[in-house]
Amino acid sequence: MTADIRLFTCLTDNFGVLIHDPATDATAAIDAPEAGPIIEALDREGWTLTDILVTHHHADHIGGIAELKQKYKCRVVAPHDKKAPIANVDLRVGQGDIVKVGTLLGRVLETPGHTLDHISYVFDDEKVVFAADTLFSIGCGRVIEGTYPMMWDSLLKLRALPDDFRLYCGHEYTASNVKFALTVEPNNAALKARAEDVARLRAENKPTVPTLMGEEKKANVFLRADDPAVAAGVHMKGASGADVFGELRERKNKS
């Protein structure tokens, strides 16, 4: 593990994230919600932005691209869906493509559902995944453009990652996600422990990410929609994972 990663707040509840390669001084931003906090974080570290790795086209993930590209002349990497309204793109990528940030290698996973163009970036050597608005800590993104089965398939791709991978997501939603998850699995010991940890972190005004994929596999009801205990929690014993996931997402939308 050689990369340096910095996490900070953008907008209201978006996360800004930088991943830096000490060997080459290359630095990538994962999305660009707004330019100001990203520039401030770069200045604090003495880093120069070389890349922006875009996950999807929503405005709260691309709003800072134009200013950052003008200032740093950085490369913009984005999903291959050219219909998505992302400007200033230098490289378009899809499933299985490798993106280099200096000597760091990021593998692209197509994770549609929240949007049709959504991708995640997996840095296997660093044991880290940047999943943006597909997988949150103890939650997942709203299914806006895709379908519930599509989103479920995307979550399964992420669930296949090893337990010791760190998850970075796009928003600080963990407290509300925990509150909802406890309505489904009030007796899940891992979830209750996570709830206590989240309450402590938020009381100290600290972020609840990164988290570990192994912890998500124990406590995230959306990631475990094919677990009989989760199905029972929404009165859908014997239903498919995709169907249980759809019910979970509908309930969360209304919560």
From Swiss-Prot:
Xref: CDD domains: hydroxyacylglutathione_hydrolase_MBL-fold (cd07723)
Residues that, per the record, bind Zn(2+) 2: 60-61, 133, 171
Catalysis: reaction(s): an S-(2-hydroxyacyl)glutathione + H2O = a 2-hydroxy carboxylate + glutathione + H(+)
Cofactor(s) needed: Zn(2+)
UniProt entry tagged with the keyword Zinc: yes
Binding site for Zn(2+) 1: 56, 58, 114, 133
Biological processes per GO annotation: methylglyoxal catabolic process to D-lactate via S-lactoyl-glutathione
Any GO MF annotation of the entry: hydroxyacylglutathione hydrolase activity
Biochemical pathway: Secondary metabolite metabolism; methylglyoxal degradation; (R)-lactate from methylglyoxal: step 2/2
Disulfide bonds: none
HAMAP family reported for this sequence: Glyoxalase_2
Function: Thiolesterase that catalyzes the hydrolysis of S-D-lactoyl-glutathione to form glutathione and D-lactic acid.
Family: Belongs to the metallo-beta-lactamase superfamily. Glyoxalase II family.
PANTHER family: HYDROXYACYLGLUTATHIONE HYDROLASE, HYDROXYACYLGLUTATHIONE HYDROLASE GLOB
Protein name: Hydroxyacylglutathione hydrolase
Native organism: Nitrobacter hamburgensis (strain DSM 10229 / NCIMB 13809 / X14)
